[in-house]
Amino acid sequence: MALPWRIRPGGLELRVRVTPRGGRDAIDGVEALADGRPVLKVRVRAAPDKGAANEGVRRLLAEALGLPASAVSLESGAAARLKTFSIAGAAEPLAAALAAMTGHAHP
């Protein structure tokens, strides 16, 4: 399976499928969409109201990667379940951390 992140200058680009009001804040692994695109499945307790769910995802990703919340920013999909986040930092260690937490081999 392809990976939902892509190395880019200054960090990573990460494709995420968000479930707001998911009962808990959690990263649930990688799945392929119907069109084959891989996404990181994330759920947050926050409702999709006034950006609360987006902020919840941003903070969850930062915490999981050991980064300050300011290192994670929403690039696209503010009002959609499918979102793209930009993660600033050393790309290789970030990719390795994502691979470890999702059980996927880092190329």
Specify the residue positions occupied by each region the protein language model found.
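Contiguous, often N-terminal, cationic amphipathic patches that form binding interfaces
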Residues: 1-58, 67-69, 73-79, 84-107
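Residues within the alpha-helical elements of helix-turn-helix
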Residues: 64
